[in-house]
């Protein structure tokens, strides 16, 4: 089955999470006007009194054509990925309770100036880089096991 890859926008992604970007976002000045603060761009949610982690994940580029065959979700916390050097990357997401609902399966490509924050329980493909090795600032939950993995029928990513 082929899965069309769409440009990432907050409107298209809102059911799955937040788009972390400055484009079309409000800001205010701090530090004597030297800094524009784009405040509260994503909801970080951590359950069970665990702690928030800030990490760097170095992702390897995927082999093309890319075929998706599994999704994961994190029921106890949100998970954010922000590329550190302006790299484009692709995310694959789906809604669903116990298993991914394939009717909601979507793929999005970023513009190089966007990160994503997955809502709790949103099914998504594990992180991968697109064209080159990419470092991602990652904000997620530390503590007990927080990852469910489900196999899905193979989906090949298609670009317009």
From Swiss-Prot:
Record-level GO BP terms: allantoin catabolic process; purine nucleobase catabolic process
Cystines in this chain: none
Enzyme class: lyase
E.C. designation(s): 4.3.2.3
Catalytic activity: (S)-ureidoglycolate = urea + glyoxylate
Cofactor(s) the protein needs: Ni(2+)
Alphabetical list of SUPFAM superfamilies matching this protein: RmlC-like cupins (SSF51182)
Top-level division of the source organism's lineage: Bacteria
Pathway: Nitrogen metabolism; (S)-allantoin degradation
InterPro entries: RmlC_Cupin_sf (IPR011051), UAH_cupin (IPR047233), Ureidogly_lyase (IPR007247), Ureidogly_lyase_bac (IPR023525), Ureidoglycolate_lyase_dom_sf (IPR024060)
GO MF term (any one): ureidoglycolate lyase activity
UniProt entry keywords in alphabetical sequence: Lyase, Purine metabolism
CDD domains (alphabetical): cupin_UAH
UniProt similarity note: Belongs to the ureidoglycolate lyase family.
Complexes and interactors: Homodimer.
Protein's job: Catalyzes the catabolism of the allantoin degradation intermediate (S)-ureidoglycolate, generating urea and glyoxylate. Involved in the anaerobic utilization of allantoin as sole nitrogen source. Reinforces the induction of genes involved in the degradation of allantoin and glyoxylate by producing glyoxylate.
UniProt xrefs under HAMAP family: Ureidogly_lyase
Protein name per the record: Ureidoglycolate lyase
Organism lineage string: Bacteria, Pseudomonadati, Pseudomonadota, Gammaproteobacteria, Enterobacterales
């Amino acid at each position: 089955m082929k899965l069309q890859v769409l440009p990432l926008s907050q409107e298209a992604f809102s059911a799955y999470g937040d788009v972390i970007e400055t484009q079309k976002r409000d800001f205010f000045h701090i530090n004597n006007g030297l800094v524009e603060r784009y405040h509260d761009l994503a909801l970080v949610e951590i359950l069970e009194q665990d702690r928030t982690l800030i990490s760097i994940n170095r992702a390897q580029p995927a082999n093309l054509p890319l075929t998706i065959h599994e999704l994961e979700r994190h029921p106890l916390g949100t998970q954010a990925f922000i590329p550190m050097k302006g790299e484009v990357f692709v995310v694959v997401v789906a809604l669903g309770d116990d298993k991914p609902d394939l009717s909601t399966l979507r793929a999005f490509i970023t513009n190089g100036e966007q990160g994503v924050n997955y809502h709790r329980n949103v099914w998504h493909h594990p992180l991968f880089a697109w064209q080159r090795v990419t470092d991602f600032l990652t904000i997620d939950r530390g503590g007990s096991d927080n990852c469910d993995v489900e196999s899905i029928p193979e989906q090949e990513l298609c670009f317009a």
